[in-house]
Structure formats: structure tokens, C-alpha cells
Amino acid sequence: MARRCELTGKAVQVGHLVSHSNRKTKCRFLPNLCNVTLQSDALGKRVRLRVTAHALRSVEHRGGLDAFLIKAGEGDLSQTARLLKREIHKKLAETPAAAA
């Protein structure tokens, strides 16, 4: 399983820990990944995703999973999130047609 956020694409970074004497030690910086279940209002179902804490705050800020995915670019999303985004777009396109 890749250490990558399914919503933002954040992954492992490589860098140096630098001491006071400027000695550099190679280090891996891992993303803060959480297994969460998010509710999709448009689809009426819960979706389990592996996302970073930063992405979780962004989802809350945008007003839920549906709003986040609609605004998100396709490049950062995982395959699962892309399929979910397409399903949400289809469902939202059907809903106004049925109401009118």
C-alpha cells in the first residue's frame, strides 16, 4: 500500500535532518495518513479513504466530501477518488433534471 493521500496526492518526502554543527543525516518525512470514512451526501453512502490530516481539514473547510471532490483537480486524486468524483458529477447532473 502506497504512503500517499488519496485526495491531495501528498506522499513521502526525502530530506536531511541538520544538526547544530551542520551535519546532515538523510531522513524520510512520512505524511500523517489516517484511515477515515467520509459521508457522500449526493450518493447517500459512506466511503472509506486513506487521507492525510491536512486533507481532512480541507474537506471540512470546503463543506464535505462532495464539495471537495467537485473542486479538486483530477491530477492529485487517486483512482478511487476519481471514480467517486465521476459518480458524484453524474448524480448531481440527474438531480436537477428530476426536480424540474
UniProtKB/Swiss-Prot annotation:
Coiled-coil boundaries: none
Sorted UniProt keywords: Ribonucleoprotein, Ribosomal protein
Keyword Lipid metabolism: no
GO cellular component term of the entry, any: cytosolic large ribosomal subunit
GO biological process, one term: translation
GO molecular function: structural constituent of ribosome
InterPro entries: Ribosomal_bL28 (IPR026569), Ribosomal_bL28/bL31-like_sf (IPR034704), Ribosomal_bL28_bact-type (IPR001383), Ribosomal_bL28_sf (IPR037147)
SUPFAM superfamilies: L28p-like (SSF143800)
HAMAP family, alphabetized: Ribosomal_bL28 (MF_00373)
Family: Belongs to the bacterial ribosomal protein bL28 family.
Protein name, UniProt field: Large ribosomal subunit protein bL28
Gene: rpmB
